[in-house]
Each structure stands twice: as structure tokens, then as C-alpha cells.
Amino acid sequence: MMKCLFLLCLCLLPILVFSSTFTSQNPINLPSESPVPKPVLDTNGKELNPNSSYRIISIGRGALGGDVYLGKSPNSDAPCPDGVFRYNSDVGPSGTPVRFIPLSTNIFEDQLLNIQFNIPTVKLCVSYRNWKVGNLNAHLWTMLLETGGTIGQADSSYFKIVKSSKFGYNLLYCPITRHFLCPFCRDDNFCAKVGVDIQNGKRRLALVSENPLDVLFQEV
């Protein structure tokens, strides 16, 4: 019996030595998995649907709240409403419904998409439903959000939805061409935060360096 145990130990010894040597000196490097995309959720905890409409609701209360809506830009000669605004209070009117149009089939966090006001309109104003970022406003020294964008093919019309560091979500503007003029696009992904600036007494969505707008999405 003792002889059998001795022989068994001799047989196992090379395996144990090889295993220890391989583990300590030559670890197995398994390929790292790509992070699973996280779906963006609405106020009911449902995943956003590209075929549904949503109101963009500011999380703040009182003067810090207010839905996002389509309105006429001050001093604009556009034939249709062409500005992206936020109402001055959370007890104000309901916002204008929007539709999120992803480059893929689903709406995930931190992925490129277009935003479109989803409302009936005349043929002349069809393109004035699509969000974009305008040129640098010399008076306000910022870039204002406006409409007149192009779905799926314009640097000025690409956005992302990311988790807020506080609560809810933030909107980012992310042109895919690095040479595109965007002095506010300073993070590693060449994106800029969307916040609020005051234009002629109205709260206008604009690119900001700090204090991004925290929002939720309510299905219409």
C-alpha cells in the first residue's frame, strides 16, 4: 500500500511543478471582453425605443426645471422655429416631443445618435426638426443648439446620452471629425457637454464647460 502511494506521489510531482511554474512565470492572458452597452432608460425604467417619442425633462425644481422645447431663435430669419430651448420652470408647459435616432438599432449610453423633434410640420420645415449645433456665437461666446441638422451625415448633428454624475442623464455633442471647429470639445472623446445659456431672457440649450443639464426622458 505504501509503495503504491509513493509511486502516485512521484507521478503527480512533475505536474504540480509545471503548474506552479506556468502560473507564476507565464500567466495565461485571456482576451478582455468589451463592456456590454447599457441601454438608456426612460422615467418608467423602460429602454428608449427609436420608434417612440419622449419629452426631455430637466431634473431641477422651480427655476432650475423645465422641459426642452422647439422655439423661434431671437433675430433669426429662418422660415420655421429653429431654436432648442428649456422652459423657465418645471411648472411651465410640456416640452416638445423628440425622437432619438441611433446609428445602430438600439439606444445605448455613450453611443452616437441624432435627435429630432417629432412633431407634424409642413414640408418647408421638415429639416427644421433635426437638432444640430450652430456656429460660435460671438456675443455669448458659446455654441447654441438649433435645428436644421442632417440625420446620419453631418458633424454638427451627432450627440450622445451619458449617465450624469449626479442623477439622470447628460447630453453630449460629439462631432466625429476632429478638425471640426468645436472649442468646447475637450474630453478624450472630443465631446462637449450640453447645458443652458440665457439668450434674450430665454433659456437656450448650448455647449458648456461646466454645469451640464441633468435630464430624464418621459415617453409621450
Swiss-Prot record:
Residue pairs linked by disulfide bridges in the UniProt entry: 80-125, 174-185
Task: State any GO CC term.
Answer: vacuole
Q: Which InterPro entries match?
A: Kunitz_inhibitor_STI-like_sf (IPR011065), Prot_inh_Kunz-lg (IPR002160)
Q: What induces it?
A: By jasmonate.
- Family, per the entry? Belongs to the protease inhibitor I3 (leguminous Kunitz-type inhibitor) family.
Main function: Inhibits tightly cathepsin D (aspartic protease) and weakly trypsin (serine protease). May protect the plant by inhibiting proteases of invading organisms.
Q: What is this protein called?
A: Aspartic protease inhibitor 4
